[in-house]
């Protein structure tokens, strides 16, 4: 009998600390499936920051290092390795905004996996830079008021304006078709790194049932009904498409 699905070899066979319904497990699997398919586990280095994914070094089979809060994409060494950072919105879009922007201006040849769940997960559900207008959090109990808290940051749209960005794409994991599309995007990002095209950033709209106060099923519906309308899915920059159009 043909094997149509198996546990990724580069994803360690251990229990994770993630909450039930959290999207990190899905994204971890997708990243590791791509690493396995490309046969690059021995040449891959992951960088994880402060946040819910801080213990991902226990789950990825490749080499993984930790970075101070927000500093994961501050990378310049080992150009022969496949390097990816795995960051949340409180990390990448808040304290790490400078590093995020300048990794794009420098065109560093790395992959950034950006998990957008509109909240600070590890610290208890405070407002994040990506929290939706009107969304209730621990620090916005009456909903995010844009007059006092400003507007959410649309990272992909911002990163697409930078010359060193090769790929900026937003995906989601609220449905099987969207999960498949997310894997394709992650694969393309790693292929870009292999071809040394520059920075590839994949933003993943994900869930945080615990801090949202929802069930896993309700959380997936929230992504579909609330997050995707505000953060439209799609490719915001793709240098390979631009090169093809010029050919």
Where are these regions (language model features)?
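Active-site-proximal loop->helix
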Residues: 97-102, 122-136
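Flexible, low-complexity linker and terminal segments
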Residues: 1-4, 8, 13-17, 194-247
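Conserved thiamine diphosphate
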Residues: 80, 128-195
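Glycine-rich beta-alpha junction loops
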Residues: 50-52, 117-119, 175, 203-211
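Short coil/turn connectors at secondary-structure junctions
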Residues: 14, 40-44, 78-83, 106-111, ...
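Short, hinge-like loop/turn segments at secondary-structure boundaries
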Residues: 63-65, 103, 128-132, 218-221
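Thiamine diphosphate
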Residues: 1-121, 184-188, 195
């Amino acid at each position: 009998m043909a094997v149509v699905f198996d546990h990724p070899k580069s994803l360690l066979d251990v229990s994770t600390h993630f909450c039930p319904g959290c999207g990190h497990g899905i994204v971890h699997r997708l990243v590791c499936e791509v690493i396995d398919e490309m046969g690059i586990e021995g040449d891959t280095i992951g960088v994880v920051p402060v946040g819910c994914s801080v213990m991902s070094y226990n789950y990825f089979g490749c080499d993984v290092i930790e970075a101070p809060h927000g500093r994961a994409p501050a990378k310049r060494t080992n150009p022969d390795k496949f390097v990816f950072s795995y960051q949340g919105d409180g990390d990448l879009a808040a304290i790490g905004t400078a590093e995020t922007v300048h990794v794009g201006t420098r065109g560093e040849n790395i992959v950034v996996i950006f998990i957008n769940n509109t909240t600070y997960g590890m610290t208890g559900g405070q407002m994040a830079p990506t929290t939706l207008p009107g969304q209730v959090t621990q620090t916005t109990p009456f909903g995010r008021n844009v007059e006092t808290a400003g507007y959410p940051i649309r990272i992909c749209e911002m990163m697409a304006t930078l010359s060193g960005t090769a790929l900026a794409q937003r995906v989601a994991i609220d449905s099987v078709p969207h999960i498949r599309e997310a894997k394709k995007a992650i694969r393309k990002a790693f292929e870009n790194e292999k071809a040394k095209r520059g920075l590839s950033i994949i933003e993943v709209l994900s869930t945080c049932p615990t801090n949202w106060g929802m069930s896993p099923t309700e959380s997936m519906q929230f992504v579909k009904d609330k997050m995707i309308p505000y953060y439209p899915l799609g490719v915001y920059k793709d240098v390979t498409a631009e090169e093809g159009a010029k050919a």
